[in-house]
């Protein structure tokens, strides 16, 4: 009888850890496409946008990220490799920047490419309410979104999803 109870508990624990990623219209998100010039993040399936969100970029938005501290958002192909909750930015999903070519370029130039590029929500304090951030580029190179949009993307995108960031 104890082994049956243990089996039931183990089954419950396994199922509770299963992915809870949602789908849009019966289609999973295959890729995140960021269009920097349009300030858009699109969730893509079969090459077509399923949903589009407005985003904010680094304070120096033109051009690809070159060195640590340049406040630019990178351009290229990356992956969502981990995620976390944050007191400062609510939900955050890490982008695998720098990729191999970013690292090689930085090594050739003798500089640090930077790191910790995230897709994240916005701070929401009395001093700086969330709507203050939505219309300007305010990050240090990350991709900022309204918290309600970030919660939705968090639930729709699984770790390992490709991220393409275009100029």
List where the protein language model places each region.
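Exported/periplasmic cell-wall-interacting domains
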Residues: 21, 82-167
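Positively charged n-region of N-terminal signal peptides that target proteins for export
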Residues: 1-4
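N-terminal signal peptide c-region/cleavage motif recognized by signal peptidases
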Residues: 13-16
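N-terminal post-signal-peptidase region of extra-cytosolic proteins
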Residues: 19-30, 37, 57-82, 100-105, ...
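Well-ordered beta-strand positions in beta-sheet-rich domains
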Residues: 31, 52-54, 77, 116, ...
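Short Gly/aromatic-enriched secondary-structure transition segments
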Residues: 48-60
């Amino acid at each position: 009888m104890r082994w049956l109870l243990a089996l039931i508990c183990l089954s419950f624990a396994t199922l509770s850890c299963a992915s809870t990623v949602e789908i849009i219209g019966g289609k999973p998100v295959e890729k995140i496409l960021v269009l920097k010039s349009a300030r858009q993040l699109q969730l893509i399936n079969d090459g077509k946008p399923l949903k589009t969100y407005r985003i904010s970029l680094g304070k120096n938005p033109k051009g690809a990220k070159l060195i640590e501290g340049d406040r630019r958002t990178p351009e290229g192909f990356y992956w969502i490799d981990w995620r976390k909750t944050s007191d400062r930015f609510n939900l955050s999903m890490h982008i695998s920047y720098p990729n191999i070519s970013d690292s090689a370029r930085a090594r050739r130039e003798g500089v640090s490419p930077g790191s910790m590029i995230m897709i994240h929500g916005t701070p929401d304090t009395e001093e700086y309410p969330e709507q203050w951030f939505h219309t300007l580029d305010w990050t240090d190179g990350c991709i900022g979104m309204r918290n309600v949009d970030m919660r939705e993307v968090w639930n729709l995108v699984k770790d390992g999803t490709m991220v393409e960031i275009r100029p």
